[in-house]
Amino acid sequence: MGLFSWRDKELDLIANQVEVDIKNNYKTSALENIKWLEETIDEKRANGKLKGKAVGEYQQMVTNFRNIVNNTKRTY
């Protein structure tokens, strides 16, 4: 069991896309991908593929992303 064995590759890919959207100031795309991330977390939790610490970590990630997006102003 590795140091980050709780990580889920699919969720990490979606989270990475959200980060890219935020860095590029693509607020609409970031919000869509945050929703996708939440839905995927819920689906994996319901199927038993995501448990315990991982659920909390990914939910915290979603909360952080939402806070960043809500505090970001469009620059165009």
Predicted regions mapped to residue ranges:
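N-terminal acidic leader/helix
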Residues: 1-32, 70
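Alpha-helical linker/edge segments of TPR/alpha-solenoid repeat scaffolds
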Residues: 58-76
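Charged, amphipathic alpha-helical oligomerization/scaffolding segments
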Residues: 10-13, 17, 36, 57-64
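Secondary-structure edge/capping motif, primarily at the C-terminal ends of alpha-helices
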Residues: 18-25, 41-48, 72, 76
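Short, charge-rich amphipathic alpha-helical segments embedded
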Residues: 35-58
